[in-house]
Structures are given as C-alpha cells and as structure tokens.
Amino acid sequence: MKRTSVFLMVVLALMLTTSIAFASPATQATIVTRLSGAEEVPPRDTDAQGIVLLKPSSDGTSLDYRLIVAKIENVTAAHIHCGPAGENGPVGVTLYHGGLPGSGPVDGVLSAGTATAPDAGNACGWETIQDVLDAMATGNTYVNVHTNDGVAPTNTGPGDFPGGEIRGQIQ
C-alpha cells in the first residue's frame, strides 16, 4: 500500500512538472492515460501499472510523450497501437525500444520524447502524426508496454508478456 501511495505521489509530481514543461499558449491539452494489466487482451494478472502523458502540438505535426511505469520488469518495448478497446492491433508509433529480455525492474520514467512521424510502413496506415491524432480522437489507439524475461516459454507471468503486460486506451 505504501509503495502504491509513493508511486501515485511521484506520478502526480511528474504530471505537474510535465504540465508546466509542456505549457504554452499555442498547444493543446495533455492527454493522460492509465495503463494496467486489466486492459490487456487477454487481461494480465500483474501488479504493474503505468501512466502516459501525450501532448500534441498545436499544428498537429508532433506529439510529446512521457511514459511512467511502476512494478514492472523486463520491459522490451512500448508503442502506440491502432485498435479499439478490447481488440489487439498493430504498432503505429514506437515510444520505447531496446530493452533486453530479462533486463530487470523498472520504476519511473521509461521514456520521454517527441514523435514527429509514425513508424515507417506501419500497418495502421498512418503517414503523419496528424493521422495518429485523428485515430486518437476516435478512441482507436492504445499504449502497450511489452515485457519478456528471455526464458521459454513466454506468457508465464509478470515480466514475461511479449504481447503486452500493461495497456491503456487513449481517450
């Protein structure tokens, strides 16, 4: 319980800091999405959780992001996928890549940056960040954090869900 309270306080502090950092009269509101194993398809039994902050530019050409996670291990990747709630879809924008299987626990900011284009050749059909923003506006996008402990078989429990351990529908 104490660890969850500390996590929530850290998230709130980061949200305030991020809001200040992203603030400018010409930009749009920050989108906040909570990530959990319950949102995965199929649902995952995990204590891992996360939050992603997304801030589109006023001209629709870029998307600032900050992905914060807690109680998660062996993160290998995180993406924005296209797809409605309750369905899995392809990767459209990479938020984090390069974590090695079996890399251990992560608590805090997993990744932060600015996306200026979706992944080249993505199966969502997105060619520009505006395409991503349009899909977000219709509820057809989600953030997924993938894990892998590097030991066969896969999907054996927390820290070993290559298809995704925590997810949140962007709304």
Language-model-detected regions and their locations in the chain:
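Low-complexity intrinsically disordered segments
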Residues: 1, 14-15
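Bacterial N-terminal signal peptides that target proteins for export
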Residues: 1-8
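Cleavable N-terminal signal peptides
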Residues: 10-11, 21
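Metal-centered catalytic cores of metalloenzymes
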Residues: 16, 20-78, 82-171
